[in-house]
């Protein structure tokens, strides 16, 4: 008597395609894309002046831990984890432009390596290494690998969380694998809450596997519950602050979705090329295509939908973490369409040449502060060259944010100028904004010379708060005015000081 039992269909496993790959090839799988992203990001790393947001990073990283924690209770909680990480980094390596941007560069390079590993698991070795290379060539990867903000770290965290989910699905009964996935996902949420929208793609993948093993829902649910326990209090705090931080982001219309790829890729040509390759993606299993397609499409659609409420969250940089998904699909498409390495390499070279103008553009001196370029460094050089002991300074805070921080960053640290109308610094009040002197006349201390820094080329006294301008006009005259890109640097001398007025 023969008893026949029907076996369940095999699980769609995502194991590395390394059976026929020599050890050197396994290393090159991730090391090649990592090195490429590192090299591209390192080129021109310090060429652009710090942006306003990067100046906030510098300011926050320079505060002690207690002050950072107190500040994020009031504002910018969504970046609190990043500020704490940067505080530790700056303590060790200083606050030069190179030092501030290196963590982002390392994260972007690491993300390229993880994308290659993901591609190997999902689509095979060729697709994996091509995906990593294509990812490294995307101009936005270099752009945000050169910015002292959290976005490159978020890309790495999302890619790593996805890789760890695949490992957990390989051995779903292994609790430590689920714990590793939960940890990576929690870090993702702590770095940027919107990036947790990638969970929609993860749930799609779990759903495919749960048809064969319903206990997967319990294991995945426990992992997500652990993430929620960590992130929800943080999310509630951030939600209470959005009115202060995102009031300026407009609600998106339908055209915003159409133009989003060009913004996310930092290259319309690059976006078009990778999307075209992504449409050619092929897989014998549906799960890889489902995962990557959901990862690429669902988060932007979700963010677009919720941005029609009280607050809009729709910015290209907020969904930058979808780039790995597009690179994975494009790597699969290229591997399927071009069977030989030589043919695939020709496509990669063509893409690099097509995106070269965008790569050059993002390394321009004022690109990080576009569309309002402000040459903080040139303004600081004017003051450094001509200052005298006892000089004071007035910054345009009327319609310009972080102009003061930018000039202070590029001034020599030993050069201290009294900020005439500053009552309390942001660090003193656990905020990002200063408190200014309520009665400007009372804040003038009789300095013979005051440097006035204003945005634009208008008459300097017209660019600052009217009450401050009135107080200065009554006692000072403009001795010299020097224009640098986006700014005017004026030297005021007390009316009883010697010297004739001149313009330069």
Q: Predicted segment positions?
A:
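Short, charged/polar, Gly/Pro-enriched secondary-structure boundary elements
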Residues: 497-504
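Membrane-proximal helix-loop-helix interfaces that form the catalytic/acceptor-binding platform
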Residues: 2-18, 25, 29-496
């Amino acid at each position: 008597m023969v008893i026949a039992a029907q076996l369940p269909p095999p699980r769609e496993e995502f194991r590395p395609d390394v059976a026929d790959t020599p050890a050197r090839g396994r290393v090159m799988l991730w090391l090649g894309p990592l090195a490429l992203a590192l090299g591209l990001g390192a080129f021109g790393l310090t060429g652009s002046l710090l942006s306003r947001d990067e100046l906030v990073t510098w300011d926050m990283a320079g505060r002690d831990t207690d002050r950072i924690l107190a500040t994020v209770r009031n504002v910018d909680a969504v970046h609190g984890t990043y500020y704490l990480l940067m505080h530790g980094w700056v303590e060790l390596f200083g606050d030069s432009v190179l030092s501030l941007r290196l963590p982002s560069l390392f994260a972007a390079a690491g993300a390229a390596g993880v994308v290659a590993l993901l591609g190997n698991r999902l689509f095979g070795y060729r697709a994996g290494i091509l995906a990593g290379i294509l990812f490294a060539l995307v101009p936005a990867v270099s752009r945000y690998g050169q910015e002292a903000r959290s976005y490159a770290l978020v890309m790495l965290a999302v890619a790593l969380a996805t890789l760890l989910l695949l490992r957990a699905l390989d051995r779903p009964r292994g609790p430590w694998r689920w714990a590793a996935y939960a940890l990576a996902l929690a870090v993702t949420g702590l770095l940027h809450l919107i990036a947790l929208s990638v969970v929609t793609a993860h749930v799609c993948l779990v759903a495919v596997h749960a048809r064969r093993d319903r206990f997967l829902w319990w294991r995945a649910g426990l992992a997500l519950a652990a993430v929620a326990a960590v992130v929800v209090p943080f999310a509630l705090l951030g939600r209470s602050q959005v009115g202060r931080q995102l009031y300026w982001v407009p609600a998106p219309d339908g055209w915003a979705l159409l133009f989003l790829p060009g913004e996310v890729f930092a290259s319309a040509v690059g976006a078009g090329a990778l999307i075209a390759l992504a449409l050619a993606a092929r897989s014998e299993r549906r799960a890889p295509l489902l995962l990557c397609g959901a990862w690429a499409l669902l988060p932007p659609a979700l963010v677009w939908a919720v941005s029609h409420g009280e607050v809009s969250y729709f910015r290209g940089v907020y969904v930058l973490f979808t780039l790995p998904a597009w690179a994975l699909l494009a790597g699969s498409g290229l591997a399927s369409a071009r069977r030989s390495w030589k043919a695939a390499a020709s496509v990669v070279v063509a893409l690099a040449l097509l995106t070269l103008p965008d790569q050059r553009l993002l390394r321009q001196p004022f690109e990080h502060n576009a569309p309002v370029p402000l040459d903080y460094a040139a303004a600081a050089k004017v003051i450094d060259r001509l200052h005298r002991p006892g000089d004071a300074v007035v910054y345009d805070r009327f319609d310009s944010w972080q102009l003061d921080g930018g000039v202070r960053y590029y001034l020599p640290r030993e050069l201290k100028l009294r900020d005439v109308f500053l009552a309390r610094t942001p660090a003193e009040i656990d905020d990002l904004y200063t408190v200014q002197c309520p009665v400007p006349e009372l804040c003038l201390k009789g300095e013979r010379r005051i440097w006035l820094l204003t945005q634009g080329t208008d008459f300097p006294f017209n660019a600052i708060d009217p009450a401050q301008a009135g107080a200065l006009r009554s006692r000072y005259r403009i001795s010299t005015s020097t224009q640098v890109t986006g700014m005017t640097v004026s030297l005021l001398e007390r009316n009883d000081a010697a010297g004739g007025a001149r313009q330069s």
